């Protein structure tokens, strides 16, 4: 089903071997991840989730809490206008990051694949892109 949906969306270099993406056989490219990002950010529920630095849940047993922390470097560093999205890592793909920033009525995204330092590279690319607008 996921692969059929990917084709429907025009994600020509994307193939899913699993829903979690951690095993061999999953693949994509920067263009497809950019398209998928645009589709995801059109969903209000997704936007609310990916902009958070952390989320905590209360467990019904003994009132304990579970804290989940996001790893989005733009959100963590307080990059101006950062509104989401997602980091990822596998041995095959290396460090990957997709980020979205809204500033001055414009929304830009950055896709980094196999990046040595997404926290360094993403802001530089976005700064350069916003400077050209």
Which role does the model predict for each range below?
Residues 1-133:
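Penicillin-recognizing serine hydrolase domain
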């Amino acid at each position: 089903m996921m692969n059929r949906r990917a084709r429907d969306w025009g994600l020509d270099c994307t193939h899913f071997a699993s829903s979690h993406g951690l095993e061999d056989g999953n693949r994509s490219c920067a263009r497809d991840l950019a398209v998928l990002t645009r589709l995801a950010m059109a969903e209000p529920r997704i936007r609310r989730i990916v902009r958070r630095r952390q989320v905590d849940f209360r467990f019904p047993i003994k009132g304990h809490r579970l804290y989940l922390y996001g790893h989005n470097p733009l959100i963590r560093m307080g990059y101006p206008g950062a509104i989401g999205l997602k980091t990822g890592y596998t041995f095959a793909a290396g460090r990957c990051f997709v980020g979205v920033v809204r500033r001055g009525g414009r929304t830009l995204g950055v896709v980094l694949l196999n990046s040595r330092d997404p926290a360094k590279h993403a802001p530089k690319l976005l700064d350069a892109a916003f400077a050209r607008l």
